[in-house]
Regions:
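Acidic, surface-exposed loops and disordered segments
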Residues: 1-203
Length: 203
């Protein structure tokens, strides 16, 4: 926005740069801005009284853990929807909102996902033992020798565990939310990781 002088009406100077983030609508102190692409769409106002203090945010960040011990009971659909809703408010580069979500709570489907993933890791470990594949990875700087060896060991162990009925993929979680995006979108992976962090804190 630009303003020619005191008392004059501000004007949008470069509309082609607008990415429809809606921030201008939120920061206007008198709600005077109308956006042609956001008419009729919900703009969520921030309830400042509910915002946590820095100390509370700091403690939440410090307390965050990767939990791999799940209760053997279903997760309510409403709870899953709340977690996904929190995820979708994550920022994204150029407001592309590229992240999409797939929620799975069917036990049989979850077991198939874990089993197929473990099988893929087992096949990958065999490929990684090929000296030519190893040379390409190291030559292109995709990993280090130590990490490469660790990959093989971890992949093979995961595959063996699954054959024994030990799930070290999903750890028999009752629900799963997959974050995905079109790989052609710039920063799609970073956008998905930001959404994942939101979901993690919400969960």
């Amino acid at each position: 926005f630009t303003q020619a002088g005191p008392g004059s009406v501000p004007e949008v100077s470069r509309p082609e740069f607008c990415n429809d983030c809606g921030h201008c609508l939120l920061v206007c102190p008198v709600g005077a801005i109308r956006h042609r692409n956001l008419e009729g769409r919900a703009i969520t106002e921030v309830e400042k009284d509910l915002l946590p203090s820095f100390r509370q945010v700091q403690e939440m960040v410090r307390a965050r853990r990767s939990i791999r011990n799940f209760l053997d009971k279903p997760v309510e659909r409403e709870m899953i929807e709340k977690v996904v809703d929190a995820a979708r408010f994550a920022p994204s580069a150029k407001n592309t909102q590229s992240t999409r979500f797939i929620a799975v709570d069917n036990g049989e489907t979850l077991r198939r996902i874990a089993s197929m993933t473990a099988a893929w890791l087992g096949r990958s470990a065999k490929k990684l033992r090929n000296p030519l594949v190893r040379a390409v990875y190291l030559m292109r700087g995709l990993t280090t020798k130590e990490e490469y060896s660790r990959w093989i060991g971890q992949f093979e162990l995961t595959a063996r565990n699954m054959e024994k009925g030990i799930d070290t993929i999903l750890y028999r979680a009752p629900a799963l939310v997959l974050f995905h995006a079109d790989r052609r979108v710039r920063f799609a992976e970073a956008n998905a990781n930001l959404a994942l962090q939101n979901a993690t804190f919400a969960a």
